[in-house]
Amino acid sequence: MENIEKKEIRPLYIRERVAVYVYCYSYKGTRQLSRFGDIVYSSQKSHYSLLYVNNDEVADLLNKLKELRFVKKVRVGHIKELDQNFSEAFIQTNLEVKEELEH
């Protein structure tokens, strides 16, 4: 055990990802979308797919996706813009419930 060399551990860099919703005219073209990002979900009935793409590549990819013949429209997810701290909402809800129970 003493002969094992200690190697430097490199830090793990997590790249920011963005959700991109791609609406298509038909379901046939959704297979081709895997070239542009990771397909997380695709709906046959609603003809849309959810891709996750690196944040720094979004602007170029949106233009490329819009140029495809089978793509109807492209939307970017807004989860990064939303406040995800729900503790204040829970406190407010608890206070409202307590007030209703007291009356």
Swiss-Prot record:
Alphabetically ordered keywords of this record: Cytoplasm
Compartments, as annotated in UniProt: Cytoplasm
Pfam families: DUF2129
Keyword Cytoplasm: yes
Major localization class: cytoplasm
Any GO CC annotation of this UniProt entry: cytoplasm
Keyword Protein biosynthesis on entry: no
Superkingdom of origin: Bacteria
HAMAP family in alphabetical order: UPF0298 (MF_01126)
Similarity comment text for this entry: Belongs to the UPF0298 family.
Name of protein: UPF0298 protein LACR_0404
Species, as recorded: Lactococcus lactis subsp. cremoris (strain SK11)
